[in-house]
Regions:
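Alpha/beta-hydrolase superfamily serine-hydrolase fold, recognizing
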Residues: 1-237
Length: 237
């Protein structure tokens, strides 16, 4: 399940179609998920939409020739945030539109390319973006407010608050050390929290790479993704 980055606005669903086709050539069925954009798509709409799309694919597994027991999330930027949150919130009802008692989800792996993790700390580190005003991507995600006025949403939206001893899928994290939009420290925090709670995570720091760099979709980078997916989606895992 692939979710495209867009600062939570309307997504260009074909932006990474070429590298995704390369991944599909290795036997993967890829569904590109369009989540509700801001300003109408208010948190946690994006997470709910990803889970709804996943359930749709599982309910049509025969039609799309997919294995309903082996599926993963993959996203970049805001799409990576949705992917990570879908995995760490698991079957919490408040993050699903469907009844989780009858349609539980169990993602087997998560690929996170330079996604935000904790919105309350985005402005602490070097960035050339406004992450806090009512017109910022996060402000619009929260309904058009300054994020400092809604501490409850900041807490609820932080992926770090859902990472504990419960079972989680393995994570592959890739982030550019020169990212000027989503601070590199966001992925560092995610990786450290996963490791502190004894979860599996691989972290690749890309030197001199900015947000959304083509370096993330080179054959070398895609080989890392393919190896990760192969290791974690193979039968018997």
């Amino acid at each position: 399940m692939y979710t495209q980055g867009s600062a939570f606005k309307r997504q260009n669903l074909t932006r990474h179609l070429v590298p995704l086709i390369e991944v599909a050539k290795h036997g993967y069925v890829i569904a590109i998920v369009e989540y509700r954009p801001t300003p109408t798509g208010i948190f946690p709409a994006q997470i709910k939409d990803l889970k709804t799309a996943t359930r749709y694919m599982l309910n049509h597994a025969f039609e799309y020739s997919v294995d309903p027991y082996r599926y993963a999330c993959f996203g970049d930027s805001s799409g990576a945030y949705a992917s990570v949150m879908a995995c760490v919130t698991g079957n919490m009802q408040e993050f699903s539109d469907e009844d989780v008692r009858f349609s539980p989800l169990h993602y087997r792996a998560c690929v996170d390319f330079y996604g935000p993790i904790d919105f309350s700390r985005m402005q602490e580190f070097p960035t050339n973006w406004d992450h806090e005003s009512e017109k910022s991507p996060t402000g619009l995600l929260f309904g058009g407010v300054n994020i400092r006025t809604v501490p409850d949403l900041l807490e609820k939206s932080s992926a770090l608050n859902y990472i504990d001893s419960k079972k989680l899928p393995p994570f592959l994290i890739m982030h550019g050390k020169k990212d000027r939009m989503v601070p590199f420290s966001q992925s560092v925090m995610l990786y450290e929290k996963l490791r502190q709670t004894d979860h599996r995570a691989d972290f690749y720091a890309l030197e001199n790479c900015d947000h959304g760099s083509d370096a993330f979709f080179t054959p070398y980078s895609l080989t890392i993704v393919l190896d990760f997916l192969s290791n974690n989606l193979k039968k018997g895992n």
